[in-house]
């Protein structure tokens, strides 16, 4: 928690060569930024159009990870204008989570990166062996087992 808010962060740092007075290592923080963190969205039902079905790509990187009851996703999508893109995670079946994007018609711009995190408090590590993450990519629908995102 930070100021009463639950926040995920990403830190770019380098190890220092200097000796420290404690058992750990000293680092210099080069950059630190917060990651948008949210709960999963309510079920689809009447919200299907609200959640959108615009494509995005998940990037297989160290920042795409399921750990500590959070699913953090590094993604790429087209950002062309000044329209807000909405990214949501919905549980569409007992064993399926679906990542959805509503780009509000803003799909033709240059491809850019983004990070988003979702709280998965009710999903145990054992459940991750059976749960599938599904999303619409630029090349069609893709899936991955949640357990494959544990590092």
What positions do the PLM features span?
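His-enriched metal-coordination microenvironments in redox/metal-binding proteins
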Residues: 63-95, 108-112
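OB-fold/S1-family single-stranded nucleic acid-binding modules
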Residues: 14-44, 142-144
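Beta-strand/beta-sandwich contexts
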Residues: 39-65
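Hydrophobic residues positioned within well-ordered beta-strands of beta-sheet architectures
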Residues: 9-11, 71-73, 114-118
């Amino acid at each position: 928690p930070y100021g009463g808010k639950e926040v995920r962060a990403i830190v770019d740092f380098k190890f220092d060569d200097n000796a420290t007075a404690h058992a750990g290592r000293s680092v210099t923080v080069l950059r630190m930024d917060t990651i948008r963190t949210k709960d999963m969205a309510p079920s689809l039902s009447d919200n299907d159009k609200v959640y959108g079905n615009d494509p995005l790509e998940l990037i297989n990187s160290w920042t795409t990870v399921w750990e500590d009851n959070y699913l953090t996703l590094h993604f790429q999508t087209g950002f062309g204008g000044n329209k807000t893109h909405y990214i949501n995670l919905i549980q569409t079946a007992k064993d399926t989570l679906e990542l959805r994007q509503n780009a509000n018609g803003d799909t033709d711009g240059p491809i850019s990166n983004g990070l988003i995190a979702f709280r998965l408090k009710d999903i145990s590590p054992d459940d991750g062996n059976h749960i599938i993450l599904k999303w619409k990519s630029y090349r069609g629908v893709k899936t991955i087992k949640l357990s494959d995102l544990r590092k």
